[in-house]
Amino acid sequence: MKTTHTSLPFAGHTLHFVEFDPANFCEQDLLWLPHYAQLQHAGRKRKTEHLAGRIAAVYALREYGYKCVPAIGELRQPVWPAEVYGSISHCGTTALAVVSRQPIGIDIEEIFSVQTARELTDNIITPAEHERLADCGLAFSLALTLAFSAKESAFKASEIQTDAGFLDYQIISWNKQQVIIHRENEMFAVHWQIKEKIVITLCQHD
């Protein structure tokens, strides 16, 4: 499968992007993965996204001196070396990965359409959060995409990932660089940026 790697500094970390072309994917490409047999029953989309995500993860791990491919955990999560944390996300034909010494979460999302935002609002934010989003100065579809992505990154950065849902992560404030999220007795600072029609969020949880 044809891929292209680029990197971008963001919030004190290096994000590793892998653009991939699913059209020229073949099953033999998966043999690069030590755990390729675990994907034999997956659909083509899942296989291409997984492969691209692991390629991005390998680039990210190289920064820390590792030459391994993250395995698949019991909950289908990437298994990182014991001394580091990492996160992988996908959007369209883009995969993204980051590695850190502290718990970290990354997410990449295409900005919602107005219709999609309208349909998903009640599943992502509370009425109180809706008021905060309405006052943030962004188009609502963009603001809701950012809220969704920020909560995804906060969830991924949680060391103990429970069955908490989007409404359990409450946005209490935000500015042009960060979204502040509260869940139970924890606070999460989520960095964000817009890249063309894409929202990228990153949460490092100390």
Curated annotation (Swiss-Prot):
Going by the UniProt record, its keywords in alphabetical order are: Enterobactin biosynthesis, Magnesium, Membrane, Metal-binding, Transferase
Q: Which reaction does it catalyse?
A: apo-[aryl-carrier protein] + CoA = holo-[aryl-carrier protein] + adenosine 3',5'-bisphosphate + H(+); apo-[peptidyl-carrier protein] + CoA = holo-[peptidyl-carrier protein] + adenosine 3',5'-bisphosphate + H(+)
Q: What is its EC number?
A: 2.7.8.-
The record lists Mg(2+) as bound by 107, 109, 152
Q: What is its main location?
A: membrane
Q: Which domain of life is it from?
A: Bacteria
What pathway annotation does it carry? Answer: Siderophore biosynthesis; enterobactin biosynthesis
Signal sequence coordinates: none
UniProt entry tagged with the keyword Metal-binding: yes
List cofactor names only.
Mg(2+)
Q: Which InterPro entries does the UniProt entry name for this protein? A: 4-PPantetheinyl_Trfase_dom, 4-PPantetheinyl_Trfase_dom_sf, 4PPT_N, Enbac_synth_compD-like
> GO CC terms for this protein?
enterobactin synthetase complex; membrane
Broadest EC class assigned to this enzyme: transferase
Q: How does it assemble?
A: EntB, EntD, EntE, and EntF form a multienzyme complex called enterobactin synthase.
Q: What task does this protein carry out? A: Involved in the biosynthesis of the siderophore enterobactin (enterochelin), which is a macrocyclic trimeric lactone of N-(2,3-dihydroxybenzoyl)-serine. The serine trilactone serves as a scaffolding for the three catechol functionalities that provide hexadentate coordination for the tightly ligated iron(2+) atoms.
Which family does the UniProt entry place this protein in? Belongs to the P-Pant transferase superfamily. EntD family.
Protein name per UniProt: Enterobactin synthase component D
Which species expresses this protein natively? Escherichia coli (strain K12)
> Taxonomic lineage per UniProt?
Bacteria, Pseudomonadati, Pseudomonadota, Gammaproteobacteria, Enterobacterales
